[in-house]
Amino acid sequence: MNKVVLLCRPGFEKECAAEITDKAGKREIFGFARVKENAGYVIYECYQPEDGEKLISELPFSSLIFARQWFVVGELLQHLPPEDRITPIVGMLQGVVEKGGELRVEVADTNESKELMKFCRKFTVPLRAALRDAGVLTNYETPKRPVVHVFFIAPGCCYTGYSLAHNNSPFYMGIPRLKFPSDAPSRSTLKLEEALHVFIPEDEWDERLANGMYAVDLGACPGGWTYQLVKRNMWVYSVDNGPMAQSLMDTGQVTWLREDGFRYRPNRNNISWMVCDMVEKPAKVTALMAQWLVNGWCRETIFNLKLPMKKRYEEVSHNLAYLQAQLDEHGVNAQIQARQLYHDREEVTVHVRRLWAAVGGRRDER
């Protein structure tokens, strides 16, 4: 199998294509990207027959910025007969996947695909039963086995393939299903909530998002991001010249500091989290984030970079490279991840975790 489907935000296909071409090429997995504007997906076609499987095995999915999900696929199945769509799909998957742990019948995240999604939901149940009978799926769902993907691009027209459970998005279509809390001050709260789901493993939440932690929210007004921190019982310094929602102030967990987020300097040395969603040039925000991390003013940070109209992948890459260079220069070992989230628009969200040990990823550093 030599094709990899990457789901992305509609309108960002070129960025997704540029990124996968760049990162696959650095691993000597060469190919070309098929791009259709506003389609919500990209197909990276490798030159070598087995390189699709090699790509999803060797390149960490967490290193991708513009892809929400990816999976390796075979040739496009077309003109599926309405009276029996299941048999051709089962036939394509037999011998490709054995004992998959989950089935996802998906579409791209576009308005045109909404009607098709209704069909996918109904189609999933009988298809799952047939795939279990054929040995393509296990008799029960398990997160330890490959995920089987059936991706419809039009009625009667789909790609079939799989992703690896340890190197994909755990979410259907790569989108966490979040509900807007009625008491939140703004919809931006969903950006931070999604970021926490995407960047922090669920089994580490109790330790890394613990009750009683101290946090700073730069550019906090009216408090959408502060709300998420308060909800996790943190003490929050909300920095903004604009007013905070009274409902947050009434919790007693928020200290409102009427200052410019770029000029504020923390007066305590036990801040676990700093978050930032300020509307400013990405280079200026990145420089500020580097300053916080180099000086050890926080342990972890989540921040947004607003994107220009052109060369968006290049802009993000340049800023992340600058941040990494600053950390390296000052001997700071850190983990950096970036993703264009479902709730992001013309922006990407970055998570950086400062590690105190020389070797990242140790259990006692989590």
Swiss-Prot record:
Keywords attached to this entry: Cytoplasm, Methyltransferase, rRNA processing, S-adenosyl-L-methionine, Transferase
GO MF entry, a single one: S-adenosylmethionine-dependent methyltransferase activity
Superkingdom: Bacteria
Example GO biological process: rRNA processing
Family affiliation: Belongs to the class I-like SAM-binding methyltransferase superfamily. RNA methyltransferase RlmE family. RlmM subfamily.
HAMAP family, per database record: 23SrRNA_methyltr_M
Protein name, entry field: Ribosomal RNA large subunit methyltransferase M
Top-level taxonomy: Bacteria, Pseudomonadati, Pseudomonadota, Gammaproteobacteria, Enterobacterales
Gene: rlmM
